């Protein structure tokens, strides 16, 4: 996924709510920016952190600036919570994910039961539902999800178990929005119930995968599969 809009650089000042923050541009101007991620991201959004903003100057926006990337030390992290779905969908269509090659129909945002899953794959009578979770939390080289309790995430896992029970394929992909990660594990400290449901789901045949990303200042591409440690 490549950002084609202009980008500008700045330093993070403070987050004022789930969707907005203040950033000082390299020009010295202090401005409001939209934060396209409702997660806490406390270890990323620290005063003085270098950030990259995408300029989306469309009518009706409160601010033209979208907080797209942030540096955590030397590690560049993609912030936008819409990116993981785009990257995974693009990668499946291009045949880059070995586990999901060979499907004839690739659809996004399809409903099953009480949930809407990110991707539905079809090959003849074979159906696979895929849920994508973006991961921005890194602790000592280990990626963790979630960074805050997620009722929605727990619900998706329960529904994936139902998909599997009905004889279809069910999978969750944790798309780690950065590189140089040792492995992925559920964040039991923040949401022990999510970890419990993930382990239960995998035990009942739901597939769990984690991939890192090659992240640049205007692009995010799928990179390497890493181990899911439960």
Curated annotation (Swiss-Prot):
Pfam families: SfsA (PF03749), SfsA_N (PF17746). GO terms for molecular function: DNA binding. It comes from the Bacteria. Coiled coil: none annotated. Belongs to the SfsA family. This is Sugar fermentation stimulation protein homolog. It comes from Thermoanaerobacter pseudethanolicus (strain ATCC 33223 / 39E) (Clostridium thermohydrosulfuricum).
């Amino acid at each position: 996924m490549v950002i084609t809009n202009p980008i500008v650089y700045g330093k993070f000042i403070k987050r004022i709510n789930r969707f907005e923050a203040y950033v000082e541009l390299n020009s010295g101007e202090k401005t409001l920016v939209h934060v396209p991620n409702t997660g806490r991201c406390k270890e990323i959004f620290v005063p003085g952190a270098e950030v990259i903003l995408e300029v989306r100057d469309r009518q009706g926006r409160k601010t033209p600036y979208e907080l797209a990337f942030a540096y955590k030390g030397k590690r560049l992290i993609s912030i936008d919570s819409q990116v993981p779905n785009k990257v995974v969908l693009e990668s499946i269509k291009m045949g880059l994910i070995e586990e999901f090659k060979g499907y004839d129909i690739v659809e996004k945002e399809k409903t099953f039961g009480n949930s809407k899953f990110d991707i539905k794959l079809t090959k003849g009578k074979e159906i696979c539902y895929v849920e994508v979770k973006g991961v921005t939390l890194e602790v000592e080289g280990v990626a963790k999800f979630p960074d805050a309790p997620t009722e929605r995430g727990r619900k998706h896992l329960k529904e994936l178990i139902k998909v599997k029970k009905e004889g279809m394929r069910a999978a969750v992909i944790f798309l780690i929005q950065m590189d140089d990660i040792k492995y992925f594990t559920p964040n039991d400290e923040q949401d022990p119930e999510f970890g419990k449901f993930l382990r239960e789901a995998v035990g009942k045949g739901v597939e769990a995968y984690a991939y890192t990303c090659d992240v640049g200042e205007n692009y995010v591409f799928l990179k390497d599969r890493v181990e899911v440690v439960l």
